[in-house]
Amino acid sequence: AASDVYKRQIMYRSAQYAAKYGTVNKKKTDDGTEEEAKDEVLVRANGIPTYFAADIAYHYNKLATRGFAKAIDVWGADHHGHVARMKGAMDAIGLHGEDLDVVLMQMVNLMRDGQPVRMSKRTGNAITLTDLLEEVPIDSARFLFNMHDAGSGIDFDLDQAVKTDNDNPVYYVQYAHARICSILKKMESEGVAFAGAENIDATLLTEPSEMDLIRMLAAFPQEIVMAAEKYDPSRINRFVIDLASAFHRFYGSCRIQGA
């Protein structure tokens, strides 16, 4: 079986890893002192690979066997010390540690009335998305989780997530979208055609709010590129909130046909 092949490969390569990295028995602590550090075990005495060995096998399969150019892992921030070991293991088995990028995610605190809350007794200290979605609409959960970059802790406000006013950024953005759709539908029903960019008289664009909106729309493609390059999709959410704000200002200050 394929899993047995990878197991044998990792067991064989583990000797190379131990020879290269297993001699280090000291490590620096946060205060600059040294303490004993255990060698990383890849195969237990009973011959069963450890989770670390399975992780190495996964990356070997992804990069060497399936030919991906890069692996992007999403880990909890409490695994930050594992990053260097994984990159070192990849180097030891003939891969390249620099082909692994790791995004470290911080923990999420659920809040209600400004206080931490536990939603489920049956799941212990961990709260599943199933538990969360019993209280919060899925669109709110997706949007609010993705408003924060990976390195920031999240205080997820359950009260805010179910509001239907401008305090909830999900509602705020959806309201802008609904206004836009209403305008487009009205214009279509009245037979108003859209002029191409080459037919627009730019001298008529004089209101600050409409100029701000145009500038923001022009910046959107680059924002997508930046979000991809930095592995930070939260940039899109924050941009969309700013864009909705710019549209609401435009809507309030300019007369719009069909509105």
Residue ranges and their predicted role:
Residues 1-259:
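Non-catalytic interaction-recognition regions
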